[in-house]
């Protein structure tokens, strides 16, 4: 029996059939695979950017990217080429806001296992707090210029002059990449709070970029869109995606548990948790730091910057508590302590901090708060002093 497959007549499928005129000479499986891949390559390209404190970054922050990507790929309407995390500037001033340096380091560690979600530290390197609209526009402009410039014809993955957040493979096509703001329902609801957002910024974000909103099961984000004239006007640019696997672990909860000396094991990425312990962030309380020293390739580079050699140094803060940004208005600036408290590994020297270069047998100082452990502490310091600086 011969089964005929009727493909929907549109520009994408027509272009695929034109390119694959030799379909009949291919095996059925190869023919179908080639057709599917070609169809995907012709879909409009999009990328996501999430703005916020990320103090610290939680698994749910990263899950939002995966949930959004799954949605668009299952709908078959767009091809997701990248995800960007942009921590807010230090001058945002929320309680519990670790220094930009620490937040960037934690985001970098949290995204090590992802091949498409990356850190952008552009925002934290500005002279002041930036509006979300300005952050979106900067990254969109950079992507546009990169695509239009042709990038010198080389593989952009090998170009060390490009920022690390830039999605790979942008030159596979000259088609544009549309950058969308990825957020939770709380941010959508905050649009309705008087004085938190400039109406011009809301309109620009929704009209020219678009929103991808991850909502909780049982919530009604459509009501907030209906109650807003601006959101209703551009509701075709707002994608609502329900998260059917709820995760209520927030940055606020993590900071609260750490401040109480309670365990957050399995609530955070192990590397992020170890970094928090070693840097003693968020009023971390523990008698000992007992985690085993990790191999050199997993040791933290406290001087991480996003391919920016002129990046500023950031210190570790002592502040506690408060949720992620739910508005576009900063709080009064908080002062941070100008010195680091632990030795850290890396190739970039920092002012006011001691940096150990990578090498075989490298160790990280273990901090102890017990006075009767001086002997053990001295022995560890002696081992560290043997490492060539």
UniProtKB/Swiss-Prot annotation:
Enzymatic reactions: beta-nicotinamide D-ribonucleotide + ATP + H(+) = diphosphate + NAD(+); nicotinate beta-D-ribonucleotide + ATP + H(+) = deamido-NAD(+) + diphosphate
Tissue specificity of this protein: Abundantly expressed in neuronal and muscle cells. Present at relatively low levels at the neuromuscular junction. Expressed in the eye; present in photoreceptor cells and various neurons in the lamina cortex and medulla cortex and at low levels in the lamina.
Signals that turn on the gene: Overall expression and the relative expression of the alternatively spliced RB mRNA (encoding isoforms B and D) is increased by heat shock (acute stress) and proteotoxic stress (chronic stress).
An example Gene Ontology molecular-function term: ATP binding
UniProt xrefs under Gene3D superfamilies: HUPs
Keyword NAD found: yes
Gene Ontology BP terms: NAD biosynthetic process; NAD biosynthetic process via the salvage pathway; negative regulation of neuromuscular synaptic transmission; neuron projection maintenance; photoreceptor cell maintenance
Gene inactivation effect: Larval lethal at first instar stage. Dendrites of the dorsal class IV neuron develop normally up to the first instar larval stage. Sensory neurons in the ventral nerve cord display extensive axon fragmentation and near complete loss of axon termini.
Compartment(s) of residence: Nucleus; Cytoplasm; Presynaptic active zone
Annotated GO CC locations: cytoplasm; mitochondrion; neuromuscular junction; neuronal cell body; presynaptic active zone
Location, primary (coarse class): nucleus
Pfam families: CTP_transf_like
Keyword vocabulary terms for this entry: ATP-binding, Cell projection, Cytoplasm, NAD, Neurodegeneration, Nucleotide-binding, Nucleotidyltransferase, Nucleus, Pyridine nucleotide biosynthesis, Synapse, Transferase
Pathway: Cofactor biosynthesis; NAD(+) biosynthesis; NAD(+) from nicotinamide D-ribonucleotide: step 1/1; Cofactor biosynthesis; NAD(+) biosynthesis; deamido-NAD(+) from nicotinate D-ribonucleotide: step 1/1
PANTHER family: NICOTINAMIDE MONONUCLEOTIDE ADENYLYLTRANSFERASE, NICOTINAMIDE-NUCLEOTIDE ADENYLYLTRANSFERASE
Function (record text): Catalyzes the formation of NAD(+) from nicotinamide mononucleotide (NMN) and ATP. Essential for viability. Stress-response chaperone protein that prevents toxic aggregation of proteins and promotes proteasome-mediated degradation of misfolded proteins; this is independent of its NAD(+) synthesis activity. Neuroprotective in response to toxic protein aggregation, for example by overexpressed Atx-1/ataxin-1. Required for maintenance and integrity of mature neurons, protecting them from neuronal activity-induced neurodegeneration.
Notes on the domains: The N-terminal region, which includes the putative catalytic motif, is not required for chaperone activity.
Protein family (similarity comment): Belongs to the eukaryotic NMN adenylyltransferase family.
Protein name, entry field: Nicotinamide-nucleotide adenylyltransferase
């Amino acid at each position: 029996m011969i089964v005929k497959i009727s493909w929907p007549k549109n520009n994408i499928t027509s272009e695929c059939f034109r390119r694959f005129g030799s379909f009949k000479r291919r095996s059925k499986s190869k023919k179908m695979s080639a057709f599917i891949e070609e169809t995907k390559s012709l879909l409009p390209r999009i990328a996501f950017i999430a703005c916020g404190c990320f103090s610290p970054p939680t698994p749910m922050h990263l899950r939002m990217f995966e949930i959004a990507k799954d949605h668009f790929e299952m709908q078959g309407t767009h091809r997701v080429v990248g995800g960007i995390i942009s921590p807010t500037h230090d001058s945002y001033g929320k309680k519990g806001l670790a220094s930009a340096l620490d937040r960037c380091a934690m985001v970098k560690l949290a995204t090590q296992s992802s091949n498409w979600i990356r850190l952008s530290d552009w925002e934290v390197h500005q002279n002041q707090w930036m509006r979300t609209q300005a952050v979106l526009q900067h990254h969109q402009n950079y992507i546009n210029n990169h695509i239009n410039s042709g990038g010198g014809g080389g593989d952009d993955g090998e170009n060390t002059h490009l920022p690390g957040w830039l999605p790979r493979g942008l030159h596979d096509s000259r088609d544009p990449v549309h950058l969308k703001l990825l957020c939770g329902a709380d941010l959508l609801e905050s649009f309705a709070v008087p004085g938190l957002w400039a109406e011009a910024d809301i309109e620009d974000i929704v009209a020219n970029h678009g929103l991808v909103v991850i909502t909780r099961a049982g919530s009604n984000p459509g009501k907030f869109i209906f109650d807003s004239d601006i959101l209703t006007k551009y509701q075709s640019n707002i994608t609502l995606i329900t998260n059917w696997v709820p995760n209520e672990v927030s940055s606020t909860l993590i900071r609260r548990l750490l401040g109480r000396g309670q365990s957050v094991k399995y609530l955070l990425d192990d590397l992020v948790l170890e970094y928090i312990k070693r840097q003693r962030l968020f009023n971390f309380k523990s008698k000992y730091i007992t985690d085993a020293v990790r191999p050199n390739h997993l040791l933290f580079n406290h001087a991480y910057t996003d391919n920016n050699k002129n990046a500023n140094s950031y210190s570790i803060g002592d502040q506690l508590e408060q949720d992620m940004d739910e508005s576009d208005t900063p709080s009064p600036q908080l002062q941070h302590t100008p010195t680091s408290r632990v030795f850290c590994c890396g190739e970039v020297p920092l002012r006011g901090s001691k940096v150990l270069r990578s090498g075989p047998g490298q160790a990280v100082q273990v901090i102890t708060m017990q006075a009767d452990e001086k002997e053990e502490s001295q022995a560890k310091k002696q081992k560290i002093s043997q490492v060539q600086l």
